[in-house]
Amino acid sequence: MNSQFQARQIKQIWQRGVARRQFLKWGLGGVAAATAIAAGGFALLRRSPHDELPTPDWVTGLSAAEYHLFDRARVVLLPVEGTPLVDSEAVPVVANVQTTLSYLDPATRKELGAGLSLFDNVVVFSHGCRFVDLEDAQARALFDRWGEGSVLQRTLTTVIKQLVYSAYWQEPVTWPPTEFDGPVSEKWGLEYLGNAPMPQQPTIDVEQEQA
């Protein structure tokens, strides 16, 4: 699955799950709450050791906070220890996420960026630290809870999971342990035709129907 196709999928999930007006109401409200935390006595809680860590030189389409969020999500969502699966550390997961997000239109990318910031910061209320600083079990439990939460929570969880999973599995190095030998569309040289329209019912001429 190429990054452009995946970007279209992400945009559709985002737009279906969170209408623009709802996002402005919920998302910006949540960001405002997180900002209030930073301005108040809990400012120290929002700080993270990750804030002091440098990002790789190739990180140009993600903020530092987004890079650390997806790098943490990679570890949390792809626990392969004790399995024959390839360690996500050996796969350019976050780089692939960056590529996918680069195909989003500016408005959707901006909204999603605010949503990612909300996801990282809002757990300060319940855990006293950001998502990137949660223990693995806590972070997985957060994904489980948000997966059954509000529309905004479910949408953000779905988007993050799909970005991380697709970024991992699109790399051929991850396929051999599952005995997957690649998409048949590539092996057979099939051209991607985009989203085909649904078949239409044939129209019946009124005179023909009366006859």
Language-model segment annotations:
Residues 15, 19, 32, 61-65:
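Short, contiguous, pocket-lining structural segments
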Residues 6-7, 51-52, 121-123:
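Short hydrophobic/aromatic segments of transmembrane alpha-helices and their interfaces
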Residues 150-211:
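Long, amphipathic alpha-helical surface segments
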Residues 18-45, 135:
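N-terminal export leaders
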Residues 44-59:
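Ser/Thr/Pro/Gly-rich low-complexity linker/stalk segments immediately outside membranes or between
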Residues 1-18:
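N-terminal secretory signal peptides
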Residues 56-58, 63-170:
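Flexible, low-complexity segments enriched for small/polar residues
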